């Protein structure tokens, strides 16, 4: 362990020079590290069911049911695009060996925020990531991708790593890049899914791939091929993420 910040420990592999993040809550002998007592035994590896060698991802296709989300001013509702991309992402991640849990798998379900929290609690002991898929809307002029990450990672940590990897992948598709957002509310993370996941020690973020109400951005989401491209970009970023963190 070479550093601990915001509850996350960065663990270096001296043989390769690379490192990974792990929740400091999973480490023993953290006090010895912090005190710099080199005479003590090294920190022992984490012992928890959460770290089991299986990439476990909860995918949340945002909105659903009566909550359609944003709209392009015509027939394209956000809840549809979110689900279609999520279904492809599930397929791609499972092909890579991940275990995937879907918050919803139909257009009719998923309008309640509490459903997200219930799924998180059900899989809290094994989930390595809560990944929420959304598409933005504003005033028809705004465009581009942004990621809503957990505030604990503002200065570095798992969701910031994944957020940057996502933006890098989206940029390859030609999507304008906006920013990584760390928004704080009165009770922690401003965004519900980030806040609820943080309470369960699950890294979580929301991908806002582009603006569904912007004419230029719509070209990135108006076909099945586009949904597959977005899902592949997300898969690439998530698989990279899992090379940087323990799971």
In which residue ranges do the predicted regions lie?
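Boundary regions of SH3-family modules and the immediately adjacent low-complexity/disordered segments
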Residues: 13-47
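Active-site-adjacent substrate-binding region
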Residues: 158-186
């Amino acid at each position: 362990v070479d550093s601990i910040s915001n509850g996350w420990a960065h663990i270096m592999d001296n043989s390769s020079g690379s490192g990974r993040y792990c929740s400091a809550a999973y480490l023993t002998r953290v006090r010895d590290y912090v005190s710099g007592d080199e005479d003590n035994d090294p920190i022992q590896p984490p012992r928890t069911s959460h770290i089991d060698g299986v990439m476990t991802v909860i995918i949340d296709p945002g909105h659903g049911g009566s909550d359609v989300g944003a709209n392009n001013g015509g027939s394209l509702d956000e809840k549809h695009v979110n689900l279609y991309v999520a279904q492809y992402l599930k397929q791609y991640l499972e092909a890579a060996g991940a275990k995937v849990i879907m918050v919803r798998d139909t257009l009719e379900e998923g309008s309640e925020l509490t459903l997200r929290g219930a799924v998180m609690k059900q899989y809290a002991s094994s989930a390595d990531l809560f990944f929420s898929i959304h598409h933005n809307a504003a005033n028809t002029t705004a465009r581009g991708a942004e990621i809503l990450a957990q505030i604990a990672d503002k200065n570095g940590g798992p969701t910031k790593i994944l957020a940057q990897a996502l933006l890098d992948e989206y940029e390859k598709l030609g999507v304008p890049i906006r920013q990584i957002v760390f928004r704080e509310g009165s009770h922690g993370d401003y965004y519900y899914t980030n806040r609820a996941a943080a309470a369960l020690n699950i890294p979580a973020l929301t991908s806002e791939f582009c603006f569904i109400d912007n004419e230029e951005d719509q070209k990135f989401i108006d076909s099945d091929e586009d949904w597959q491209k977005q899902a592949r970009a997300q898969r690439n970023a998530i698989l990279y993420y899992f090379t940087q963190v323990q799971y």
